Amino acid sequence: MEMKNILNRMLNHEELTREETKNIILGITQSEFPEEQITALLTGLQMRGVTVDELLGFRDGILETGVPAILNCDRYIDVVGTGGDRKNTFNISTTSCFVIAGAGYKVAKHGNFAATSVSGASNVIKNHGVQFTDDLDKLNRSIDEAGIVYLHAQLFAKAMKFVGPIRKALQFPTVFNLLGPLVNPSQPKCQLLGVANLDQMRLYNKVKHKICIDYTDYYTHLTLPTTSPVYI
């Protein structure tokens, strides 16, 4: 795949197909594109906005090149947010995971280091002394005994690791903020998802119906004296 052709098409306001965005991820994981081209791609997508099929294709590529996390329990939930709302809130989804697990419902939390915020889920978990692992025995022991397991994105998704430094340098949200909640390697059937704005909520509603996940969206600007929109 020629990234030059992709970028030229984007300059002409053309949409990419699901297969094309999947192949972009495959190319990223095989180091086919220089950082400058990946930076241009992420910037262009952020300025134009990503389509449902483009997002699904990126998701397909990440899952195809990633490592699955097979958990030996029937039902569990992921509580996750896109980040990038620029409001410098605390880690709402990460905190919620411990509340839910404490209430007795199993949680498979997927997260990463901060790219566009002060602190990501992995920053919080690591600073509390948890060692990241992709060892399935340890992961299953964690969810069995503690009711919660943490899945660090860069251990399971090659593309996330490749684009990490680029995202950090850009300092604004990219399509990978949207992808994080869609590529949990354990593929939970239930998810509570926090989004940065209402446009993202509508986008996820279309995406989730195509991949058949039982989920609830909430707008992450949560405050005590006011209500927050929820999409079920």
Residue ranges and their predicted role:
Residues L42, F90-A146:
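A glycine-rich phosphate/pyrophosphate-binding beta-strand-loop-alpha-helix module
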Residues L193-I213:
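Gly/Ser/Thr-rich active-site loops/lids in small-molecule metabolic enzymes
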Residues Y219-T226:
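Conserved small/polar residues in nucleotide/adenosyl-binding loops
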Residues M1-N88, A103:
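Acidic, glycine/proline-rich low-complexity segments that act as flexible tails and inter-domain linkers
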Residues G81-R86, G111-S117, F156:
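Acidic, glycine-rich active-site loops and adjacent beta-strand->loop/helix elements
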Residues V230-I232:
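Hydrophobic alpha-helical segments, chiefly the membrane-spanning helices
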Residues K138-G194:
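Phosphate/diphosphate-binding glycine-rich loops and adjacent basic-rich segments that engage nucleotide
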